[in-house]
Amino acid sequence: MTLMTKFLGAVAATALSAGAALAEPALIFDLGGKFDKSFNEAAFGGAQRWAKETGNTFREIELQSEAQREQALRRFAEAGSNPIIMTGFAFGDALGQVAGDYPDTDFVIIDMVVDAPNVRSVVFNEHEGSYLVGMMAAMASKTNTVGFIGGMDIPLIRKFACGYAQGVKAANPDATVISNMTGTTPAAWNDPVKGSELTKAQISQGADVVYA
């Protein structure tokens, strides 16, 4: 598990604690499920740790479609869950529609900013960590060619890619950076076959270090 996912688990645990005295909190996982070996799973791990340490419980739901985002938010808010935590930027639009209808409910969203008094937005300087990864990749590479593979092609993932490329160039100005995304729709987050194909393609082009 990466440092970022470990930190996300800590964020989830902290966010749950913020409303523990108010009501049973809720955690809404993004598409991909709570065992995605990524952000969802990190958040689930943090929530489990919080439950074990405090003896409290939390509600949860794994979404099956985009249409369920607003539905899940309203369902938990109506049930009195507080706070309600979402594990990804894709909840932004739905939360913008819902937050104002439940002013006494606290919401937490990760990787997106929603400007509302009852919303806590958790964002990261992704490019900074990726810059350091890029420097290490350049120093480790023996071919002077390294790769980057992102998920859905969105500004957030481009921040990872940009920081990585700049770190590579800082350590080795002559290095080549090959960059690919697995797709342009949410399905890109759960496409290991495409990720494998892109990795093999980058290796065939000389990349001996790939950041994904």
Where are these regions (language model features)?
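A residue-level marker of the well-folded mature domains of exported/periplasmic proteins
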Residues: A23-A212
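Gram-negative bacterial Sec-dependent N-terminal signal peptides
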Residues: M1-A23
